[in-house]
C-alpha cells in the first residue's frame, strides 16, 4: 500500500525567534536523550545477563576472556606474539577494550562497560542511517526510529538465558568482546554509507561516502574476513539488482560495489604480513563436504534454542524479522520505492541470504556466523519505519505530529526521573550480582601460589578464566589432551623459559591419559571451588610436564615464526 500513496507534504514550520545557542541546546538535548535511552536499554540487557546463566558465557568462557588476557599481557610489557584465530581483533576490539580497562578497574566492570559502549555504538549507526534515509524528519523522529530496533533487540536479549555458546542467542553473544561485535557494527555501518554514495546531494558527499566504504571494508576485513560475506558481497549484489531495476545508474552501482570489494581485497592483502598471528587460514573453513551436516546443525540449533518458552518467543521474533525483511526488499524492488529506501532494504536482505547460503555451503557449524539474521532486520526496521511515517498521512488522512512542547517537556522530565531511578537500580544490581563478584576460584589459586614464581598448565576451557581473574602470580599455559603446548588465542611469549609445576583440572578437562599415568602422583592436591590443582613441584612430574610443553611449544613457535 505504501508505494501507492503520495508523499507527505513538507511540513510548514513556524519558528519563534531563537538564538543559535538555544537551537543548538535543543538539538543537543534531543540527541543526548537518545543516547540516554540507549544506555538505559543497555543497562536492562546487562542486568538480565548478570542474573542469568548467560553470565557464564559473558564473563568466564575461554573465548570471552581473550581481551582481558591481551590487556594484561600489554600491561605487563610482554612481547606481542599472540596466536589469534582467523580474526585478528585489531579493529576495534583490542583498542576499545584496552582504553576502557585503562580507566575502569576490574575485569567484570571493563567487560560490562565494553558491552554498553557496543550498544551505544549500534544506536549511533542506526541514528546515522535514519538521518540519511529520511533527512527532513525532525531530530525527535529520527532518534525514535533508531531507538525502536535497539528496544526490539533488548527484548530478544531478555529472552536469552542459557549458559551455552552454541545457540542462536546471539544478541547477548554480540555484547561480548570476542564474538564479532566489531564486524557486526561495520556491517550495519555500511548501510548509511551506501545510501549517501548512491543518493548524496552533492558529488563531494558521494565521493566521501565511497572513501568511507573503502576504508571501512579494508579495516573490517583486515580484522575479520567475515565482513566480505556479511557486507561487501551483499552490497555488490544489491547494486546490481538496483541497476537492473533502473533504480541506480551504472556509475554509482559500479562505484559502490567496487568500493567495498576493493576495500575488502586491500584488507585481506594487509593480513598477509600478519600471517604469523593467524592460527587458522580461510581455507580451513572451506568444508563443502559438510553441507548436510551444516544444515542439520543450524536446524537443530534453531529448535534447541526454541525449546523453552523464552527461546520460542525469540525464535518467533527472528523468523518474523527475517521473512519480513526479505519480503519488504522484494516489494521495494518490484514497486520501485525510492533508491534511498530500496537500497538499504535490499542490502539487508542480500546479507541475510548470502550469510545463510555461505554458512551452509561452506559446511560451517557455528551459530555466531549468523549475526546478520538479527542485526540486518534491525537496520531494515529503521528504513521501513521512516518510509511508513513518510507515507502515513496519505494512508490515514491525518498528519502525524509530536505533542506540544510543554507536554513533551513534562513527559521527558518524568521519563528522565524513571530512567535515572531504573538505571541506578540496574547498576546496583550488577554490582551486587553473584556473577560480578570476585572470582573465588581464581582468588583461591592466587592464595595458594602466595606470590611464588610458579607456572601451571591446563586445558583451554579450564584455565583461561583463572588467568584472567587471578593476580599477576597466576600464569597457566594451555595444553592439549596429550600434555603438549597449544597456541590458540594466547601469547607464545608465555611459553619461554617456564618450569611447569602444577596442573589445573575441572569437569571439562579431558586428557588422552590420566595425569597420574603420565606424570605420576602429585606432591599434593588442592581444591579451589570447581577446580582441582595437582601440585608436582619437586617431583618427576614437573620435569616431564615442563619438557613436553617446552619441546612442543618450541616447535610450534618456530613453525609460526613468532
Placement of each model-derived feature along the sequence:
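Membrane-interface alpha helices of multi-pass inner-membrane proteins
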Residues: 207-225, 233-236
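Short hydrophobic/aromatic helix or loop-helix immediately within or flanking a transmembrane segment
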Residues: 66-72, 83-109, 290-305
Amino acid at each position: 500500500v505504501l508505494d501507492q500513496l503520495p508523499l507527505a507534504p513538507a511540513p510548514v514550520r513556524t519558528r519563534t525567534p531563537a538564538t543559535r545557542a538555544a537551537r543548538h541546546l535543543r538539538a543537543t538535548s534531543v540527541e543526548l536523550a537518545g543516547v540516554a535511552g540507549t544506555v538505559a536499554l543497555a543497562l536492562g540487557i546487562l542486568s538480565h545477563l548478570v542474573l542469568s546463566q548467560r553470565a557464564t558465557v559473558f564473563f568466564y568462557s575461554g573465548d570471552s576472556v581473550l581481551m582481558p588476557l591481551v590487556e594484561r599481557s600489554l600491561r605487563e610489557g610482554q612481547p606481542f606474539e599472540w596466536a589469534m584465530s582467523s580474526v585478528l581483533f585489531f579493529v576495534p576490539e583490542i583498542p576499545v577494550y584496552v582504553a576502557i580497562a585503562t580507566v575502569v578497574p576490574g575485569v567484570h566492570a571493563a567487560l560490562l562497560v565494553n558491552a554498553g559502549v557496543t550498544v551505544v555504538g549500534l544506536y549511533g549507526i542506526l541514528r546515522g542511517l535514519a538521518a540519511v534515509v529520511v533527512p527532513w524528519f525532525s531530530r525527535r523522529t529520527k532518534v525514535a526510529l533508531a531507538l525502536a530496533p535497539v528496544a526490539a533487540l533488548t527484548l530478544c536479549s531478555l529472552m536469552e538465558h542459557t549458559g551455552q555458546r552454541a545457540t542462536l542467542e546471539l544478541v547477548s553473544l554480540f555484547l561480548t568482546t570476542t564474538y564479532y561485535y566489531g564486524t557486526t557494527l561495520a556491517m550495519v555501518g555500511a548501510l548509511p554509507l551506501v545510501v549517501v554514495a548512491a543518493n548524496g546531494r552533492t558529488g563531494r558527499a558521494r565521493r566521501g561516502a565511497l572513501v568511507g566504504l573503502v576504508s571501512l571494508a579494508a579495516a573490517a576485513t583486515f580484522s575479520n574476513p567475515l565482513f566480505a560475506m556479511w557486507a561487501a558481497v551483499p552490497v555488490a549484489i544489491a547494486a546490481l539488482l538496483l541497476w537492473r531495476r533502473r533504480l541506480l545508474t551504472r556509475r554509482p552501482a559500479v562505484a559502490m560495489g567496487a568500493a567495498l570489494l576493493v576495500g575488502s581485497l586491500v584488507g585481506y592483502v594487509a593480513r598477509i604480513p600478519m600471517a604469523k598471528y593467524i592460527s587458522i587460514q580461510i581455507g580451513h573453513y572451506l568444508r563443502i563436504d559438510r553441507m548436510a551436516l551444516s544444515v542439520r546443525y543450524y536446524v537443530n540449533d534453531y529448535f534447541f534454542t526454541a525449546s523453552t518458552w523464552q527461546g520460542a518467543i525469540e525464535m518467533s521474533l527472528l523468523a518474523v524479522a527475517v521473512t519480513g525483511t526479505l519480503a519488504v526488499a522484494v516489494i521495494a524492488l518490484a514497486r520501485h520505492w525510492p533508491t534511498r529506501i530500496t537500497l538499504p532494504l535490499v542490502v539487508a536482505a542480500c546479507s541475510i541470504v548470502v550469510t545463510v547460503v555461505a554458512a551452509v555451503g561452506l559446511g560451517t557449524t557455528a551459530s555466531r556466523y549468523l549475526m546478520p539474521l538479527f542485526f540486518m532486520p534491525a537496520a531494515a526496521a529503521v528504513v521501513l519505519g521512516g518510509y511508513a511515517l513518510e507515507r502515513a498521512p496519505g494512508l490515514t488522512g491525518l498528519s502525524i505530529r509530536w505533542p506540544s512542547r510543554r507536554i513533551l517537556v513534562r513527559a521527558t522530565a518524568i521519563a528522565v526521573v524513571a530512567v535515572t531511578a531504573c538505571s541506578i537500580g540496574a547498576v546496583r544490581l550488577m554490582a551486587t550480582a553473584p556473577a560480578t563478584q570476585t572470582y573465588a576460584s581464581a582468588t583461591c589459586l592466587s592464595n595458594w601460589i602466595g606470590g611464588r614464581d610458579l607456572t601451571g598448565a591446563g586445558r583451554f576451557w579450564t584455565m583461561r578464566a583463572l588467568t584472567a581473574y587471578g593476580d599477576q602470580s597466576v600464569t597457566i599455559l594451555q595444553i592439549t589432551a596429550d600434555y603438549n603446548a597449544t597456541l590458540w588465542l594466547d601469547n607464545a611469549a608465555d611459553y619461554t623459559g617456564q618450569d611447569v609445576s602444577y596442573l589445573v583440572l575441572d569437569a571439562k578437562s579431558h586428557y588422552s591419559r590420566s595425569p597420574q599415568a603420565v606424570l605420576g602422583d602429585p606432591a599434593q592436591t588442592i581444591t579451589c571451588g570447581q577446580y582441582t590443582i595437582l601440585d608436582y613441584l619437586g617431583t618427576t612430574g614437573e620435569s616431564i610436564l615442563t619438557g613436553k610443553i617446552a619441546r612442543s611449544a618450541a616447535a610450534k613457535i618456530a613453525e609460526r615464526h613468532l
